[in-house]
């Protein structure tokens, strides 16, 4: 099973739409977004995605009521999800992940830093797909996570 990872979209509709189109072209039907969508208008393309979207709030998601109206499934992290036989922990910032939550997960997906990170620590895979918005690093990135192989492919979206 392959799932899409997208984070820190920060209201940048062109790259959000490009990422979602790419995921559909690659037959990805499940997305994980660990937060920082920002405004409800930027959540609308995620709500329209023709698959399942798991999403947590980020530190810049101030308009929580509006976001929850567009994406009723949005949650405070940590969010535990089981997909393809893997236990996944979704949270905006890695440093906010409690040891007890990490212990329950095989894969930990975070955002916040805007930097791509793929790191194995003992038997845990930590992944940050970077920033879809490209505002901080100049790179608009998303990732594909192959759950069977626990392999991550980072993809760059044209700005």
Which residue stretches match the model-derived regions?
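Active-site-proximal beta-strand elements of phosphoester/diester hydrolases
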Residues: 2-10, 87-92, 125-130, 154
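Core catalytic region of metal-dependent phosphoesterases/phosphodiesterases
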Residues: 2-83
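Active-site environment of divalent metal-dependent phosphoester hydrolases
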Residues: 10-15, 38-41, 60-66, 95-99, ...
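Binuclear metal-dependent phosphoesterase catalytic core
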Residues: 25, 77-84, 103, 120-122, ...
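Hydrophobic/aromatic beta-strand patches that form the interior of the parallel beta-sheet core
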Residues: 32, 54, 107-109, 125-127, ...
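Internal catalytic-core helix/loop-beta-alpha segment
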Residues: 78-119
